[in-house]
């Protein structure tokens, strides 16, 4: 086929239309169809697959605990700088389950109790065993004294007397215990004394949920034992059937619509989900909000950049605790703002746990440099200690996540106390825990078709742009080249002239005088050929001779 026979104008129109159709399909129609399908499936509708996974997470989460072993307790008692060693991880499986579920179709809500169950994994903990002996701050002693000194100082003598009776002899703020006793099995506490101070102290510890009964005369204290396999509270959340943006959002906790731990309304709100689910269709500007009853606060992860997980493109989110002194909106978390705010990179957990405890990232990563200077033995590493989520914005799927939180004691001297009067004023790390999960191929393959559609959609879009643009421009150029005839303009030949000067003649007319000077006309020799009609025969061809009488006037 000859190019002259091709209708390049039609080809250009077809290419332009193909580009428009391709862009419309890839940027509007196909994405909307996918979103419609996701809206139908990403709802906590009774009997749905998502609902079953939400009620009981079908795999165990990784729960790892690291404990800071105090190597110089006696020096600390005299005001010295602590030296610590990170011992761990001690590995547990964490199973999350929701039960006693009630649905309300009118409100589009579900109400349930939630429990966490931890199972020790010695195979993954090895070479550690959980039987290691470690030295840590004894929260039942120094934690109680610090809390009473801060909030109810008038009761300090009574509490001190009760502690002297229960822990006789009371000689240190630290205790050496077996790891598993500290974490789950429990440290025995003798509450058999009939002394009023001792009975009042044991009764107070029991009512606060700090200890569990061991027998008629003893109770036991541990970090996680009381919460293992028991309800952490009753939640009411949105199911997301009517509005998918509300999926999993916490409405009430233990029938309360807000907390009462803080002075400001903003800090007492439940913001976000219970961290086991997140809504879909988020953007990079949105935060991943989750509220936790263990810390009585909402934490929001922020977008930090693009990432990938097992070949899937994801968005990387992290959490920065920041500095409340520079955040007036959330200074309601401070005891006495702005000077009473916790150090940069920490959050005050005292109102929630009833003890002077600060939360932070492990090894004070991202915190005030003074926190690191006050303790020997800390080695912050972003890969090991930062909080992260590899997240898919469209489906709300966390492919891989690690929530890491360190618990620290706000240490200070106990005023007027012989044993604890020389303690340094500083933030002492006690332990840190990591709760995390990473989807294996069993779960990621279920999302693969969706990502294949995304790749296909992106391919259609860019092919439409590239081929449509090149085809339109190329066809338009060929149409112009073949069908738009150029106009040939003949160059005009310019008349060439030669000018000669004629010497004037002198005449006396018989008077002996020269006549007045006359201006003689120039004789122009014209050499012209092929002149246009305007010149050829127009002016030059029709020039009449000048009469002699008129020449005299020159």
UniProtKB/Swiss-Prot annotation:
Query: Which sequence ranges are listed under topological domain Cytoplasmic?
Result: 1-10, 479-554
**Main location, first listed in the record:** membrane
InterPro entries from the UniProt entry: CD36_fam
Q: Say yes or no: keyword Transmembrane present.
A: yes
S-S bridge residues? 267-332, 296-352, 334-341
Coiled-coil parts of chain: none
Record localization: Cell membrane
Region annotation (Disordered) maps to 498-554
Q: How does it sit in the membrane?
A: Multi-pass membrane protein
**Record carries keyword Membrane:** yes
- Which residue ranges does the entry give as Extracellular-facing topology? 32-457
Tree of life domain: Eukaryota
Q: Name one GO cellular component term.
A: plasma membrane
Provide this UniProt record's keywords sorted from A to Z: Cell membrane, Disulfide bond, Glycoprotein, Membrane, Olfaction, Receptor, Sensory transduction, Transmembrane, Transmembrane helix
Q: Where is the composition biased (Basic and acidic residues)?
A: 514-528
Q: GO biological process: any one?
A: sensory perception of smell
Single GO MF annotation: scavenger receptor activity
Q: Would you list which residues are glycosylated?
A: 69, 215, 228, 440, 457
User: Where is the chain membrane-spanning?
Assistant: 11-31, 458-478
Q: Which family does it belong to?
A: Belongs to the CD36 family.
The task this protein performs is described as: Plays an olfactory role that is not restricted to pheromone sensitivity.
Name of the protein = Sensory neuron membrane protein 1
Q: Which organism is it from?
A: Culex quinquefasciatus (Southern house mosquito)
Q: In the record, what lineage is assigned to the organism producing the protein?
A: Eukaryota, Metazoa, Ecdysozoa, Arthropoda, Hexapoda
